[in-house]
Amino acid sequence: MSQPEPLNTQRCSPPPKRETLRVMFGRIAPGYDRFNTLLSFGQHHRWRRFAARQCRFPPGGLALDVGVGTADFALEVIGKTGRAIGVDPCEPMMRAGVEKLCRRGARERVLLVAGEAEHLPVAGDRFDCATTGFTLRNVTDIDQTFAEMARAVRPGGRVVSLEIAKPRIPGFAPLFFLYFYRLSPLLARLFGGDVEAYQYLPRSLKEFQSREELADSMRRAGLIEVRWYDLSGGSVAVHVGTKPG
């Protein structure tokens, strides 16, 4: 495996969008988990559990989590016996993740590495699965991200994405959009969150790919047996693809 980049290593200046997002997520890192629970009414735990089951992760296996953040998804995937490497460009988020890993007694089984989703600092054909949760809306190149995740997993391994989606159920979709675009920033303001960040998150969905487009992106990365599952009325989608071999 290539040498991971230490958390305190100086990097070249990233593109403006990347740097802006890195700073923004750094600001919300201390309260990120709390606001996830608040804004999703606690459903994000159920979503991750479902997505983790799609990984078909073997006992004692090795997982890769892209956009690891505070390590919730990685912990869900690896269970009590697995190991993981988590990659994220935001050091404050990973510091919050390290604190959580220590509290859960999993610090020795999960390595957090500074890096970008489009250029993962890991060797190929190495991981039993690669996951990403609520990250793709923030990357600069989704095709390249999936290509890197596909490169990293061993033949037969799965790539799994968990993301916010646009509901298609008549009657529910307008209610979701009202909540997501209008009420969630208001809740952030009322409960002392970063209003700018929680205004960005709804905006990011407007320009995000459809389910079909994400599936096509997986296929362009060489993944097969691509499919998706809608959760919570279609407000969340889990995409799954398999590396041939």
Q: What are these regions, as identified by a protein language model?
A:
Residues 224-245:
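Core SAM-dependent methyltransferase catalytic element
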Residues 1-31, 180, 191:
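N-terminal, positively charged/glycine-rich alpha-helical extensions of SAM-dependent methyltransferases
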